[in-house]
Amino acid sequence: MAVVPLLLLGGLWSAVGASSLGVVTCGSVVKLLNTRHNVRLHSHDVRYGSGSGQQSVTGVTSVDDSNSYWRIRGKSATVCERGTPIKCGQPIRLTHVNTGRNLHSHHFTSPLSGNQEVSAFGEEGEGDYLDDWTVLCNGPYWVRDGEVRFKHSSTEVLLSVTGEQYGRPISGQKEVHGMAQPSQNNYWKAMEGIFMKPSELLKAEAHHAEL
């Protein structure tokens, strides 16, 4: 699915000049930066040659690669209404826009570091419960200028990059994997993308807090 047509939808706020509330919301399409290694979460129709054999997930330095867009959705078997703010501690799915597969993990070993494999799984946005990740952050909501961690809801590893680099056919891309221990390697930040306008509920809460 191409990213450009999303710009034609109503109720969107771009990354620049958006809401002063600055929250990340369901339905937003974003790139996620690993702040330690300065790479964006990425996938493509290239499968692992070991482990699960599923679609690989990597980190890339390119800012412009369209294969780094992910749609934020509710956890498996739930609907998260467009514009609903993501709460700290909330389970979500991240669906790769161009291939329709979800960020996924399981008890396979990653090919380079020997940590837990992270892959992209499913068809047209539908996979299984191993696609669920819990957003770890400070405060009530995931805010766009803040760093977050993603904890795999089933195996409890943290989405991480530690710098291992692939050769051909994806030369220069970094391994993305799951790690049990928190560290600077598992912080992420929302960067470029299309951010859905926060729901009226959050605006009402913010107005009430100001009174």
Swiss-Prot record:
The UniProt record lists the keyword Repeat: yes
Record-linked Gene3D superfamilies: 2.80.10.50
Keyword terms of this UniProt record: Repeat, Secreted, Signal
InterPro entries: MIR_dom_sf (IPR036300), MIR_motif (IPR016093)
PROSITE patterns for the chain: MIR
Domain MIR per the UniProt entry, residue ranges: 21-75, 83-138, 139-193
Entry's Gene Ontology cellular component terms: endoplasmic reticulum; protein folding chaperone complex
Domain of life where this protein originates: Eukaryota
Subcellular location: Secreted
Segments forming a coiled coil: none
Protein name stated in the entry: Stromal cell-derived factor 2
